[in-house]
A protein has these predicted regions:
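Gly/Ser-rich oxyanion-binding loop with an adjacent helix/lid
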Residues: 76-152
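Glycine-rich beta-alpha junction loops
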Residues: 30, 142, 169-174, 221-222, ...
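ATP-binding N-lobe of GHMP and related small-molecule kinases
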Residues: 1-92, 106, 110, 114-116, ...
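Short beta-strand segments
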Residues: 9-11, 27, 138-141, 147, ...
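Anionic-ligand binding region
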Residues: 144, 148-154, 173-204, 214
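Glycine-rich, charge-dense phosphate/pyrophosphate-binding loop(s)
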Residues: 206-298
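Short beta-strand-to-loop capping motifs
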Residues: 38, 170, 261-265
Length: 298
């Protein structure tokens, strides 16, 4: 079992990309780094003011994940001091909870010497998160496509796509469970077919590096965007502006409240500056997809 300190780095993620609802995830270049050292009691120290409202004791999601992961294998872990550095906006649709869960799994694996397989980590994370899209991308990096039920887990990975990314962050946070409450319980068979076709074509286009087609399909979602977009100021106006500046497509990042914009490579800074100027109540952040998922450094 680990005695000396170590660190874990986990990327931010976006999920869905429109019609890839609850099964498509993309790792992003924003990161959370956690330094773990032995301590007399669990204590989490956040270096970013945005995280100041989170628990700093055993009720913290990272610690709960560590303890629950170890307990699955009848192991207990010694208390740690966890120093957290993160540039991932909290509660803004960039997978902050999935990042915490992925980090907790990696820390438990290290502290208790669990020797978890990749599939073990993916199953644990997806069960804890309740869906697989964000946590698979956080653990594996690149782009992930997942099939997850109580009985089965399948994940395929793609390399990080050669695009730029702009995330439009509003001033308010949104809990995923609140956003999920906006969704209908049922879709008609005809609607489901249309949504499935858009998601399949988008994924195939991404695999073929055809981001023009992928961007169009990204905006054809019927599973969640029509119901969630009402909570976004200037949603349609922002989408029109994205088209004007040459973006491939725009959609909701995960469950929101941020927006995900795919743009041609090396244009993300320019597009972010233009959107920042036009929509000052949002914060436009330029970034790229991330190739690497969670990693441990000793």
């Amino acid at each position: 079992m680990a005695e000396a300190g170590f660190s874990v780095t986990v990327p931010a993620t976006t999920a869905n990309l429109g019609p890839g609802f609850d099964h498509l995830g993309l790792a992003l270049s924003l990161k959370m780094k956690i330094e773990a050292t032995p301590a007399l009691a669990w204590f989490i120290q956040y270096h970013d003011k945005e995280y100041a409202s989170l628990p700093t004791d055993e009720t913290n999601l990272i610690v709960q994940t560590i303890q629950q992961t170890a307990a699955r294998y009848d192991q207990a872990v010694a208390p740690q001091k966890l120093v957290v550095y993160s540039d991932i906006p909290l509660g803004k649709g960039l997978g902050s909870s999935a990042t915490a869960i992925a980090a907790g799994i990696e820390i438990a694996n290290e502290l208790a010497d669990l020797q978890l397989s990749k599939l073990d980590k993916l199953c644990i994370g997806s069960e804890m998160e309740g869906h697989a899209d964000n946590v698979t991308a956080a653990l594996l990096g690149g782009m992930t496509v997942s099939y997850f039920t109580e009985e089965e887990m399948e994940v395929l990975t793609f390399p990080a796509p050669p695009i730029g990314v702009v995330i439009m962050v509003p001033p308010v946070a949104l809990k995923t469970e609140t956003s999920r409450g906006l969704l209908p319980e049922y879709l008609t068979h005809k609607e489901a077919i249309r949504g499935s076709a858009a998601g399949s074509l988008m994924t195939a286009a991404i695999a073929n590096s055809d981001w023009v087609t992928a961007g169009r399909m990204m905006e054809r979602d019927i599973y969640h965007e029509p119901y969630r977009k009402i909570g976004f100021p200037n949603f349609d106006e922002i989408r029109s502006a994205c088209r004007e500046v040459g973006a491939y497509g725009m959609t909701i990042s995960g469950a929101g409240p941020s927006l995900f914009i795919a743009v041609p490579p090396e244009t993300e800074q320019q597009v972010a500056a233009l959107l920042d100027q036009r929509f000052p109540h949002y914060q436009a952040i330029a970034m790229q997809p991330a190739e690497n998922g969670a990693c441990v450094t000793k």
